[in-house]
Amino acid sequence: MGDSIHGRDLMSDRTTRRQVVQAGAGLALTATLAGCGLGEGPSGGDTTQRITPKVDGDLVYFNWAQYLNPSLFKEFENRHGVTVRESNFDSMPAMMAKLQSGNHYDLIFPSAEFTHKLVGADRLLEIPRDKLEHADVVYSYFDDPWYDPDSAHTVPYSLYVTGLGYRADKIDSMTGSWRDLTNPDAEGRSYILDDYQEGIGMANLVNGFDLNAVDPDQLEVSKEYLIGLKPDLRGFTSDTITSMASGNAWIQHLWNGDVVNIRYRVDNPDDIQFQKCREGLPVGSDCFAIPVDAQHPGTALLFIDFMLEKAAQNVKWTGYPMPTKNS
C-alpha cells in the first residue's frame, strides 16, 4: 500500500463512484478532455436516428462499480427477458479511452463535463423524451442543462457533493473545515480522493480561491498546499467504502453517497459521519447516455425508463439522490 501522497492505497474491491463534476472546470480538466482525442475516434452512426424503448438485444452496461442497485438488474432481466452485461471503469478518462478505442457499449454514465465533450463530438444518440413513459418524474431544472442543450442526449442519473467522512468512534472533534484532513486525532489515517480534480478543487477552496481556479499562481499555491499535507496523510484512494468500513481510514475525502454504503458495512452506523466543509463543496451530477455506436439502443432506452420508474429503490441502495420527483 502506498503511504505517500504520491502513491495510491489499493483495495480489493473495484473502484466506486466517481469523478467530480464542476460547471466551468479548470485547465486541468480541459487538458484531460483534449487528451481523449474524440475527434480522431472511430466513426459512429447517425446521432439523430429515432430510437424507441424496446428490446433489441442484451444490455451492454458501462458504469462505475457499485453505482446502481444490483437487484434492479435482475428485475429488469426478468421483466424483459434480457441479460445485463456489466463492465466497469475507474475514472472518466478511462471511460473515454474505452469509447475511443472502439469498444461498444449500450449505456454509459458520463459526468456533466464529459457529457458536454461527448455531445460536442457527436458521440451520443439523441434520447426521445416523448418515448419515455416516466420522463415526467425528472425535475424541470434538467430540461435544458448547460452540458446538453435541451437535454437532447441525456437523462440525469445522480447528484452528489464532496466532503469529509469521518469515524466518530475514533475522532473526538471536527471543526467543519477541509483543514480537518490534518486533525491530529486521525494519527495519519487521513485519505484524499484519488481524483486530481477533487484534490485541486479542495485545495483551491481551502486557500480561498474559486473551486475552478485557473490562475497559474493560485494553482501553484494549491499544489504546494497538497504537497504540504504529505506528512499527515496515509495516501490517496478511490475505494472510500472499503477504506472507511475496514477502519483503515479515520478521515476520508469522499462523495456523500458513499457514506450510506459505508454505514451498511459497519456494526454501528452512527460511527460514520459526513461533514460539509464551510469553505465550499463541489457539487456534481452524472447522466444516462447512449453512445452513437450502441448495438442495442432500444434496450438501453428501455432500461433508462425502467430506472426512472425505480428511482426510489435505487437511491435507497446507492445513497446518491436522483433528480426525480419519485425518489
Task: Annotate each PLM feature.
Residues 1-15, 26-33:
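N-terminal secretory signal peptides
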Residues 37-39:
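Bacterial signal peptide processing site
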Residues 46, 50-117:
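Early extracytoplasmic/lumenal segment of secretory-pathway proteins
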Residues 104-110, 125-163, 189:
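A structural signal for short loop-to-beta-strand junctions that line the ligand-binding cleft
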Residues 125-135, 154, 269-282, 291-294:
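Short beta-strand->loop
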Residues 170-176, 208-214, 294-300:
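Short helix-loop capping/hinge motifs at secondary-structure junctions, enriched
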Residues 191-195, 199, 203, 210-275:
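Ligand-binding pocket segment of bilobal, Venus flytrap-like solute-binding proteins
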Residues 286, 291-327:
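Mature extracytoplasmic/periplasmic domains
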